[in-house]
Amino acid sequence: MIQPQTHLNVADNSGARELMCIRIIGASNRRYAHIGDVIVAVIKEAVPNTPLERSEVIRAVIVRTCKELRRDNGMIIRYDDNAAVVIDHEGNPKGTRVFGAIARELRQLNFTKIVSLAPEVL
């Protein structure tokens, strides 16, 4: 469950290392975001000499959460960290690699480019 002021790791090589959620896209006063939701975030930590800089406002899609994700078949998936992938306004990832496992639900939400870049899909 991601809410405003939550810090997330970045799961790609776009140049950002840590994000802070400032808004959840989709509804006017939605409180929590889950896997597959798009958020507006600010970069809190970035790699030097990359296109993304600290304090830049970007969009990201959540790919991992510590809160459990319950599937229709009863399976529960939980990750060790909260992580997101930086995207542009069309929903394409800004990085060329994705690190770590991501959930299968992203494919159903039309984030197929992120799924194809991921080393492991759970």
Curated annotation (Swiss-Prot):
- Superkingdom is Eukaryota
GO molecular function annotations of the record: rRNA binding; structural constituent of ribosome
InterPro entries hit by this protein: Ribosomal_uL14 (IPR000218), Ribosomal_uL14_bac-type (IPR005745), Ribosomal_uL14_CS (IPR019972), Ribosomal_uL14_sf (IPR036853)
List the SUPFAM superfamilies: Ribosomal protein L14 (SSF50193)
Q: Under the cellular component aspect of Gene Ontology, which terms does the record hold? A: chloroplast; large ribosomal subunit
**What keywords are annotated for this sequence in UniProt?**
Chloroplast, Plastid, Ribonucleoprotein, Ribosomal protein, RNA-binding, rRNA-binding
Q: Where is the signal peptide?
A: none
Question: Where found in the cell?
Answer: Plastid, Chloroplast
> What would be one Pfam family of this protein?
Ribosomal_L14
Some GO term, biological process aspect, for this entry: which one? Answer: translation
Oligomeric state and interaction partners are given as:
Part of the 50S ribosomal subunit.
Q: Name the family the entry cites.
A: Belongs to the universal ribosomal protein uL14 family.
Q: Which PANTHER family match?
A: 50S/60S RIBOSOMAL PROTEIN L14/L23, LARGE RIBOSOMAL SUBUNIT PROTEIN UL14M
Quote the function comment for this protein.
Binds to 23S rRNA.
Q: Which HAMAP family match?
A: Ribosomal_uL14
Protein name according to UniProt? Large ribosomal subunit protein uL14c
Coding gene?
rpl14
